[in-house]
Amino acid sequence: MRCLRKRQTIYAYSSSLTVLYLTQGKDWYCNCGSSTFKYSTFRPLHVQYGISKSMLTNLSRGVTWEVCWSCTCLYSSSSLGPVRKGGGFIEVFISSCRRSYSSWLKRGNSATMDAHVFGSSSSLLYCELLFVLCSRCPFMVCISQRRKSSLKLNTTLPMFALNLICLLRSILYSWKTFVRGILTFSFDVELVGLKFV
């Protein structure tokens, strides 16, 4: 498995405050045996999530994200026999928070979405987007539960429960950063998510 790391800068967000756009024009390559698969971001890579207006405003100010494309070689059946296809996932998080949470990230968390975000359906099997949204890294913000085929914001009880779990895990992870973060923490009922003010 090969991991290609690039940096992308947020350049805009929608008026609805639920869509985040990353820079276009980045090509990703997966080498699977003798085959090479190329994925181009021919349209903005976007993700919908529930988060506060103030957080999105901060994210829109040229914040640098680190993007990692990890290739996996998957197979599917066809009339000609097994066909090797390229696949992978993208890890997206604010680089300034990476060191603080690297060990926690390796253990995994629930802030993961599955989506077909770019590439053709015949060559791209899936993408996983892993987000860590931090405001001066006060503590972890989980923005959505894992969804297999949808990017729609879940504003139901499971979303509330997920945020509660993330908050409790943050307390266990680091008491000091939690205290610093809780001073500026409020709950956004409309978005049913974590909000920083």
From Swiss-Prot:
Query: Which of UniProt's keywords are assigned here?
Result: Membrane, Transmembrane, Transmembrane helix
Instruction: Establish whether keyword Transmembrane helix is in the entry.
Output: yes
Gene Ontology CC, one term: membrane
> Which spans are transmembrane here?
150-172
- How would you describe this protein's topology in the membrane? Single-pass membrane protein
Q: Which domain of life is it from?
A: Eukaryota
Q: Does the keyword Transmembrane helix apply?
A: yes
Q: Where in the cell does this protein reside?
A: Membrane
Q: What is the protein's major site of localization?
A: membrane
Q: What else is known?
A: Partially overlaps APM2.
Write the protein's name.
Answer: Putative uncharacterized membrane protein YHL019W-A
